[in-house]
Amino acid sequence: MNANPLFPAILLILPGLVQAAIPAATDRAFADFTALPLELLPVLEGVTDRDSAEQSAEKLNALLPRVYDSRTAMTRIETLTPEVKRELLQKYEKDMRTNWGKVYEQIFRLQNRRCYNSLAFFKQFHALCMMLEK
């Protein structure tokens, strides 16, 4: 039999390499999703009247593809082991809750103000809310 002496070592190393690739991609997704509110907040907080809502509509529209991509990447968490899920939540949960909590405060504020009657802003705002709901 012609067995490669490195074969047992490869079998021990390979699972670690395969598992490491999945958390790295998911780790990036979590980092992006956690940081995304820091880009959204200035746009949402800047809306204080109809004129500022009109100006913010374009800025919000520019951010929507990032919201969609980040949200889509986050769905990959379901394919991970419970241990990896737990580790990622320990790493990001506090910042994620804090950052997204601030975004939701702004969403509720803007809903109560009816987006300051700006149709342009309302369209982008509605798209943002729909993306976050799924």
List the predicted regions and their residue ranges.
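Bacterial N-terminal signal peptides that target proteins for export
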Residues: M1-F7
